[in-house]
Amino acid sequence: MSLNPRDVVIVDFGRTPMGRSKGGMHRNTRAEDMSAHLISKLLERNNKVDPAEVEDVIWGCVNQTLEQGWNIARMASLLTQIPHTSAAQTVSRLCGSSMSALHTAAQAIMTNNGDVFVIGGVEHMGHVSMMHGVDPNPHMSLHAAKASGMMGLTAEMLGKMHGITREQQDAFGLRSHQLAHKATLEGKFKDEIIPMQGYDENGFLKVFDYDETIRPDTTLESLAALKPAFNPKGGTVTAGTSSQITDGASCMIVMSAQRAQDLGIQPLAVIRSMAVAGVDPAIMGYGPVPATQKALKRAGLTIADIDFIELNEAFAAQALPVLKDLKVLDKMNEKVNLHGGAIALGHPFGCSGARISGTLLNVMKQNGGTFGVSTMCIGLGQGIATVFERV
């Protein structure tokens, strides 16, 4: 494959094991330390990259307060081998934050404003709760449906509009746990999980190299027994078909194709296009549809050209309408989230965009695909998507 000098390539990807936010493995680990551990280990693994060459550390994080405040990108960077002469910024696009971090780095590389970037994101939802310090504008209900800030209710709305049944959602949730468990047993996550010290349920320090969020004993019967989580009267969305509240971080090394060639590095993939899009906040989960369509058009591709898709599983009631309207629902078992998704692994907000993108690249590497799309919905009505080509 012929690459242009300013093409944007992904050199490597790593993530923490995903930990439960309530009493999980990361309960005594700070968000900056999780982030710094990933950055340091990924740079050690890629010793041809001089940390002094890093132009900027771009880190996604949604709730930027407490230990995640005051520019956590810089806080984490200062704990690593990256010198003080490199810069750092924290970005938020809610659920799409670390994919936005990737896009920001890519745009800088494309415009010759740097060659080497470290991107990723973190969310410690056990230490910094989802609503900590949040004060929504009461006048917002004049401009968008009042329930638009309640993600579970927007999923209920989207599922109802598209005729998604409770049974379909339960089957999708079961699939996520089964595939994530299978991927774990077969070592499919080995290249992406960077082991970390944490604490087990008995309080003993140990090294974790697996996700503690996966429930291999999940059954359709156990899912069917769960009560609706957001709409008790007639709702279909449950805790078992929603993304888990978890703690985690993800990281990528991104650079220009020219710099990768100069360093003798074989990249994982090249970015072919990027896009963001807005939708009605009341159906925020639909955002991946226009974002993906826009990204495909920019890449000169159609959905039929795409070998693998990683779609963030915010809710089964949201994911299924997206797959239906992207016309891949009938190809789901061959193309979509082959290692499970956020229903099994969790959705630490700032982490997820880079996490699903990196998982996609590993799926492509392991299965020989050429083109892949990572995409996700975003609270209050947005979508974001990236098209990759395996190098």
Curated annotation (Swiss-Prot):
UniProt xrefs under SUPFAM superfamilies: Thiolase-like (SSF53901)
Family recorded in the similarity comment: Belongs to the thiolase-like superfamily. Thiolase family.
Taxon lineage: Bacteria, Pseudomonadati, Pseudomonadota, Gammaproteobacteria, Pseudomonadales
Catalytic activity: an acyl-CoA + acetyl-CoA = a 3-oxoacyl-CoA + CoA
GO cellular component term of the entry, any: cytoplasm
Key words of the record: Acyltransferase, Cytoplasm, Fatty acid metabolism, Lipid degradation, Lipid metabolism, Transferase
UniProt-recorded name of the protein: 3-ketoacyl-CoA thiolase
NCBIfam families: AcCoA-C-Actrans, fadA, PRK08947.1
Quaternary structure and interacting proteins, as annotated: Heterotetramer of two alpha chains (FadB) and two beta chains (FadA).
Pathway involvement of the protein, from the record: Lipid metabolism; fatty acid beta-oxidation
Record EC number: 2.3.1.16
Source organism (scientific name): Pseudomonas savastanoi pv. phaseolicola (strain 1448A / Race 6)
Cell compartments where the protein resides: Cytoplasm
Matching HAMAP family: FadA (MF_01620)
Active-site residues per Swiss-Prot or TrEMBL entry: C95, H347, C377
Designated gene of the protein: fadA
Major subcellular site: cytoplasm
A GO molecular-function annotation: acetyl-CoA C-acyltransferase activity
CDD domains listed in its UniProt record: thiolase
GO BP terms in the entry: fatty acid beta-oxidation; phenylacetate catabolic process
